Design a protein with these regions (language model features):
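Short, charged recognition helix plus adjacent turn
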Residues: 52, 59-74
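Short alpha-helical "recognition helix" segments of helix-turn-helix
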Residues: 20-22, 50
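Recognition helix of helix-turn-helix/homeodomain-like DNA-binding domains
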Residues: 26-42, 64
Length: 74
């Protein structure tokens, strides 16, 4: 499962809309949508925001993003 797929599931389980998540994380809705579609990589700012909102540690988000990047290189 790619990071974007996981993020979409977490958002669904949270009961929030993508727009609500973007607003609470102080990121644009298009940027969040690009993350979900795996068109944008995660960064520390996003990972910290997701930790604060969802309780999933920053390192998990960053490691998952790194795994996605490594898989692209293969």
């Amino acid at each position: 499962m790619k990071l974007g797929d996981f993020l979409l599931k977490v958002i669904f389980w949270s009961g929030m809309t993508q727009a609500e998540v973007a607003k609470k994380c102080n990121i644009s809705t298009p940027a969040l949508n690009e993350l979900i579609k795996n068109k944008r990589g995660i960064n520390v700012k996003y990972a910290k925001s997701f930790e604060e909102l969802f309780g999933i540690p920053t390192m998990i988000w960053l490691m998952w993003g790194n795994i996605d990047e490594l898989n692209k290189e293969e």
